[in-house]
Amino acid sequence: MDQARISFFPDGLRVMIIDDDAKAVRRATATLSQLQYAVVATHSTASAGLRALSGDNVVEIQAILCDVHKVVSSGFDFRRVVESELRIPVIYLLSKMEEEDMVAGEDAEFLNHLLLTATYIVRKPLNPTVMARLWRVVAWRMYCLEERIQANVAANAGAGGEDDDDDDDVVIVEEPQVHFKVVRRTSGGSRKRQLTINVVDDGNRGSGSGGGGGGGADANPTRILQHITSNLQEFRTKHQKKDMAIERPLISSDSMFLKAILPTLKISPCNPLTLTGGIGSSSVAAEAFAGGSSSAAPLQIPVFQQQSTGNGNTVISFSNNASPMAMRAPTDNTMISFNNVSAAPVANAVISFSNISRSAAMQAPAARGQHLSGDVQQLDFPQQKLYFGPFSYQGPPPPSMHNHINLLPPTSSPVTCSMDKGKVPIIELPYGMPVDDFLVSQTTYGGAGPSIGATDAAAAAYPYTDAPSNNVATGCLMVPPMGPAFSITEPTVVAQGEGTGTGVDAGTSEKNAIVEAPNNPAPLMVLDQVAADAAMDVQEDIMFSLESLLGPDYDLLPMEDVSAPDTAAAGDAAGGSLDGEEGGMDIGWDLDLDDILVENVNDFAFLDNLAGSE
């Protein structure tokens, strides 16, 4: 017998035990060791054993002894999975079950299924005589699993061979293959990507004659090629439109006419009227325009003319006449005339400015002018800044807005915030000062600004201008507010009788300053609401009803269904029955809802007459 076992298992039978009973595992290991069965691994659950068998570090195992109750608790057929996938025989261990260990329901049905389909079942504790013949069961099961796998392979191969013999059932369709390859052109021209299409006909790949079904095979690649060509055309058209949309627009300096005419004007390079990108007098286009010579052309085109009148006015005239012409401007105004005649008509556009623009134009010296030609003279005027907004960082207002904005004088009353019932609050601020700077300035130097709901008198207590000791410009919002000043005086010691000690009395001026100091509440603070919150915090013994705490859908009190005679007896004893004669629901506790007190800590405090206390 030993020789037969050694012929099947030369290195001995290697076994895995799956059981959570440590005592049973030690006993089984000792029994199997006497029979030269090596226990190489033990696990407490079927899932852990399956994970170990499916891992990377798998030891050679020839049989698995598994407690059937561990398979029931795992929820899957451990034997079927292991034997079909790993081809390792699984033998179930069945122990004597106590009454508390009995299974029922679906677990009982699953246990019966496992026992009916089991390969071999051994009762616990293990019998050495029975385990001595275990190697025969393992060898026979391994042989059956190998034969079953070979039969399945042969069956699949036979099914495939029959299909190969029957040419009518199998239809093999060979379609031409289209290979796409993305390449980049190295030569000149467009550097866009193009598709190289290689059409290969599988039917003619083996033979070079190209015979057999040429019409049908050639039609498919043609349609594919046409389809791809149309898609490429749409792609190129779309990208051409996109490229045209993002092209650089033609600027005025690129005009050939300007490149040819600008060198003949002899304009200084620092002239602001000279366009960027113009070419010099040595240009070929300029020489062709000037008659083939690089010298100055006799054509003289005046750019603009300017004359100063005796009454302090400035006249700027744009015309096509080469000689300067005198135009009479209105009194104390500046006129800009755009016309093509020597005399200014009545309908010319007249743009009037205040004396600021006039003085800027009058102060330009004639010595700074640059001569363009014998009859044209240009004066360099100081550039005026352009202002767009009324705030301080945007500069002073333009002269045209002086008549539309009323500035508050520096010696005016401080900023006030008035609010009438039913109207939007009106805030008066000096011109050019942002509101946010005003709000920040009220708290920058430690003072509290007036609240939104403050009266006019309270807001007037925070002056921000006309402070003689501030040493800053009048009207600045960042000046610290002028609040009541307090002075520290020497305390006056007043005797309060013999042996009673001394008391400290503040000075009269300090008392008066404290009395006269306004009470500045914090902004957006409602005193009535603060007082109401403080009153609510002082209250104690807050009472709530049970319905308000539990909600309408919560049923705390258990209801008991009693019969008619029991209901009558219970009603006489406790006085709590709803309807003793007809039967109904009775409250199980001998207390009412008024006996339950809810304190402010949300804890239920019951009286001594709770259920069962009597």
Curated annotation (Swiss-Prot):
Post-translational modification: Two-component system major event consists of a His-to-Asp phosphorelay between a sensor histidine kinase (HK) and a response regulator (RR). In plants, the His-to-Asp phosphorelay involves an additional intermediate named Histidine-containing phosphotransfer protein (HPt). This multistep phosphorelay consists of a His-Asp-His-Asp sequential transfer of a phosphate group between first a His and an Asp of the HK protein, followed by the transfer to a conserved His of the HPt protein and finally the transfer to an Asp in the receiver domain of the RR protein.
Domain Response regulatory: 14-139
GO molecular function, one term: transcription cis-regulatory region binding
Ranges for region Disordered: 200-220
Compositional bias per record (Gly residues), positions renumbered to this chain: 205-217
Keyword terms of this UniProt record: Activator, Cytokinin signaling pathway, Nucleus, Phosphoprotein, Two-component regulatory system
Chief subcellular location: nucleus
Compartmental location: Nucleus
GO cellular component labels: cytosol; nucleus; protein-DNA complex
Biological process per Gene Ontology, one example term: cytokinin-activated signaling pathway
Residues with the 4-aspartylphosphate modification: D67
Transmembrane segments: none
Listed InterPro entries: ARR-like, CheY-like_superfamily, Sig_transdc_resp-reg_receiver
Disruption phenotype: Low fertility.
Protein role: Functions as a response regulator involved in His-to-Asp phosphorelay signal transduction system. Phosphorylation of the Asp residue in the receiver domain activates the ability of the protein to promote the transcription of target genes. May directly activate some type-A response regulators in response to cytokinins.
Family that this chain belongs to: Belongs to the ARR family. Type-B subfamily.
Name this polypeptide is given: Two-component response regulator ORR33
Organism from which the protein derives: Oryza sativa subsp. japonica (Rice)
